[in-house]
């Protein structure tokens, strides 16, 4: 039986979505620079005839695959939005208006109004920042190694909080809020380790991304912010940072179970619906 798959070729990761023999939605993931591994996997799936591809590296991957498969290309955000709406339905959410923050290598932020979407903005701070700073500061360069170390890290000896500045005096804002990411590293002899550094890097990224998302949500009076992206996958520390900051500003954070695969899911759905 001929089959179709969806591929989201991102700056760091390439995600694949397909239906297995039992018609269950299934995912594969590769580093985008491991194109040989991607092609080897595809060759083993002998039933694949059509690929819908999206993402920043879609053109590059398409050139390698076009002789062997029928290729359908889809705009990156259209694919992501189709995937997000599918997951929202599967997880029983009934939300039509929201801010969508996609934390990939960098971060992009969109307003969603029913079936319309507008790009609000973005930042170069994202998953690539986490990995780049992790490599520079600790020489750890694999995401799978960063996550468990982050879980046991603490930011108290590296970040300056509002409470640190006011020193017990009543402050105008919450004492636990960060006044300066990594600020203590330059001012005092701190007792910190690699886990603490990694936790603080994630704190910096999480707070920057959340602050931008909150500004956009407040501007449009939107209550819900959906955070997606592979950077959040199994990354409870980052999710907690984003969640607490979002709730502090009276907005509702939502993390979708397969949010990191939204683009690949959307590409798959686009191709299968078009085919049918």
From Swiss-Prot:
Keywords: ATP-binding, Coenzyme A biosynthesis, Cytoplasm, Kinase, Nucleotide-binding, Transferase. Its main location: cytoplasm. The active site is at residue 76. It catalyses: (R)-pantothenate + ATP = (R)-4'-phosphopantothenate + ADP + H(+). One of its GO terms (cellular component) is cytosol. Transmembrane segments: none annotated. This is Type II pantothenate kinase.
């Amino acid at each position: 039986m001929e089959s179709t798959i969806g591929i989201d070729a991102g700056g760091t990761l390439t995600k694949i979505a397909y239906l297995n023999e039992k018609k269950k939605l299934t995912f594969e993931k590769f580093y985008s620079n491991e194109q040989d591994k991607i092609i080897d996997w595809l060759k083993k799936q002998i039933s694949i005839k059509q690929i819908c591809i999206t993402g920043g590296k879609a053109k590059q991957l398409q050139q390698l695959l076009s002789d062997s498969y029928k290729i359908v290309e889809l705009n990156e955000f259209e694919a992501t939005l189709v995937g997000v709406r599918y997951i929202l339905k599967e997880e029983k959410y009934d939300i039509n208006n929201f801010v969508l923050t996609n934390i990939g290598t960098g971060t992009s932020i969109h307003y969603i109004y029913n079936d319309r979407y507008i790009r609000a903005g973005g930042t170069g701070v994202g998953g690539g920042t986490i990995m780049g700073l992790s490599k520079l500061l600790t020489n750890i360069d694999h995401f799978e190694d960063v996550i468990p170390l982050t879980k046991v890290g603490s930011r108290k000896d590296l970040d300056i909080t509002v409470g640190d500045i006011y020193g017990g005096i009543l402050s105008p804002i919450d004492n636990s809020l960060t006044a300066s990411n990594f600020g203590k590293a330059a001012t005092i002899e701190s007792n910190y380790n690699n886990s603490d550094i990694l936790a603080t890097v994630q704190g910096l990224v999480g707070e920057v991304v959340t602050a931008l998302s909150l500004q956009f949500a407040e501007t449009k009076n939107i209550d819900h912010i959906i955070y997606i992206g592979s950077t959040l996958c199994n990354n409870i520390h980052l999710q907690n940072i984003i969640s607490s900051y979002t709730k502090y500003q009276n907005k509702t954070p939502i993390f979708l179970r397969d949010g990191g695969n939204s683009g690949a899911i959307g590409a798959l759905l686009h191709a299968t619906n078009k085919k049918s």
